């Protein structure tokens, strides 16, 4: 507590000195930060395999400092989600969540499309041919499979680091489950999104029906997409709020996604990860509950040294990239 009081006093003294300095007339302060060359950095950094991430269905690279790039890596199968994928995604994002050096993540698909969704041929033995003949036991078995598959995308949402989905080509079925668990979605002009499950005789059960209404805020449109399995093209996805930006092609989109990840990773990890936690809490709770939650959260987070470092950089017109924040 004493350390927090000392930090608060130092921050107050710093602000007082800056506010009364001659180059800040009228006791006003601007927190405008100069732009960062994230775009150049994103496109100019050679990719390297990330240590401790070796998978069959995924490729994980260190795109740049503090940024990991996770690729769905079954291009010959249109990145279809086989049994190995469902296990490896959980393993991958559990590691990322614990990786103190990682501050932002980009997810994309290798090859010609983001993903064709569930690999039904690979998973047929588990889903369509359960063992036994007792209805209750078969039901419990299938429920266990469903909840494990749900966790594959829950770990993305629960990951404290912001996750950016970069979609090109088709994003079908399970792909929509995946991207709606991400924090930010970019897409290329050739992208389309399809809630495909109704065409194969089932209801989507690993996240789309729960997250998509919250993402786009239009229940009528969600119902239309889920009942018909029609394609939502890139421009409609932008207009509905499913994605925040559309780019001419995959290459430009990936550069932009990595640039955004670099910009996010230049900020205080305490601030960014606290923001993600509170945004997710606020999505599922009332305004009053969420205000109480963030007050309890920030009663400790306001004591971070990152606050003083960020304010000092702003008052000196320095880029946050020049500030060294400790790992989190």
Curated annotation (Swiss-Prot):
Motif Microbody targeting signal: where in chain: 326-328
One Pfam assignment: ECH_1
GO biological process, one term: fatty acid beta-oxidation
Modified residues (N6-acetyllysine): 327
SUPFAM superfamilies, per the entry: ClpP/crotonase (SSF52096)
Chain positions recorded as substrate binding sites: 116-120, 174
Location within or outside the cell: Mitochondrion; Peroxisome
Major subcellular location class: mitochondrion
Reaction(s) the record says it catalyses: (3E,5Z)-octadienoyl-CoA = (2E,4E)-octadienoyl-CoA; (3E,5Z,8Z,11Z,14Z)-eicosapentaenoyl-CoA = (2E,4E,8Z,11Z,14Z)-eicosapentaenoyl-CoA
CDD domains to which the protein is assigned, alphabetical: crotonase-like
Top-rank taxon, per record: Eukaryota
Residues recorded as bearing N6-succinyllysine in the entry: 231
GO cellular component: mitochondrion; peroxisome
Listed EC numbers: 5.3.3.-
Presequence positions on this chain: 1-26
Pathway linked to the protein: Lipid metabolism; fatty acid beta-oxidation
Annotated site location: Important for catalytic activity: 197, 205
UniProt entry keywords in alphabetical sequence: Acetylation, Fatty acid metabolism, Isomerase, Lipid metabolism, Mitochondrion, Peroxisome, Phosphoprotein, Transit peptide
Positions carrying Phosphoserine: 268
Described purpose of this protein according to its UniProt entry: Isomerization of 3-trans,5-cis-dienoyl-CoA to 2-trans,4-trans-dienoyl-CoA.
Family, as annotated: Belongs to the enoyl-CoA hydratase/isomerase family.
Subunit structure, interactors included: Homohexamer.
NCBIfam families assigned to the protein according to its UniProt record, in alphabetical order: PRK06142.1
Name this protein carries in UniProt: Delta(3,5)-Delta(2,4)-dienoyl-CoA isomerase, mitochondrial
Provenance organism: Pongo abelii
